[in-house]
Amino acid sequence: MHKLAHTSFGIVGMFVNTCIVAKYVIINWEMFSMKKVNNDTVFGILQLETLLGDINSIFSEIESEYKMSREEILILLTLWQKGSMTLKEMDRFVEVKPYKRTRTYNNLVELEWIYKERPVDDERTVIIHFNEKLQQEKVELLNFISDAIASRATAMQNSLNAIIAV
């Protein structure tokens, strides 16, 4: 009986020890998993800055080549997509700081990308139109932007995947 009790205790003891080891492994695995999740989460969130940097570099490249600001590029793209509209309507699509507004639109007029029109019945309203004479320049600009995006596509996709995984 004594031997049986010792054997039973030995089996129970082994079971208890196994449970303790298993619990230790589970706790350490959870901490490791949490650390990995935290590291992956932090990495993914940091990729927002990396992606933003890639986007900013595209706009910088366009600005350098075409002498147009980000807002001016976005105004043109919006006109090409939506058609002519008032300045007030454009404000819903492209945010231009009030102190830059006049200069931004006037620069596009000077570069001949757009022209302004004031309706006869309302002198306060200004409608902007894309200058259709610059159709070829439009194609060249779109190709330039597409190439700038394509050259960073893999890096941006990797950043985006890491962000989405968060």
Curated annotation (Swiss-Prot):
InterPro entries: HTH_MarR-typ, MarR/SlyA-like, Rot, SarA/Rot_dom, Transc_reg_Sar_Rot_HTH, WH-like_DNA-bd_sf, WH_DNA-bd_sf
Molecular functions (GO terms): DNA binding; DNA-binding transcription factor activity
UniProt superkingdom: Bacteria
Gene Ontology biological-process entries: regulation of DNA-templated transcription; response to stress
Record bears the keyword DNA-binding: yes
DNA-binding positions: 87-110
Keyword field: Activator, DNA-binding, Repressor, Transcription, Transcription regulation, Virulence
Family: Belongs to the rot family.
PANTHER family: HTH-TYPE TRANSCRIPTIONAL REGULATOR MHQR (PTHR33164:SF56), TRANSCRIPTIONAL REGULATOR, MARR FAMILY (PTHR33164)
Function (record text): Global regulator with both positive and negative effects that mediates modulation of several genes involved in virulence. Negatively regulates the transcription of several known virulence factors such as lipase (geh), hemolysins (hla and hlb) and proteases (splA through splF, sspB and sspC). Positively regulates the expression of sarS and other genes including those encoding cell surface adhesins (clfB, sdrC and spa). Also, modulates the expression of genes not previously implicated in pathogenesis.
Other comment: Virulence accessory gene regulator (Agr) and Rot have opposing effects on the expression of selected target genes and agr also controls negatively rot activity by an unknown mechanism.
Name under which the protein is recorded: HTH-type transcriptional regulator rot
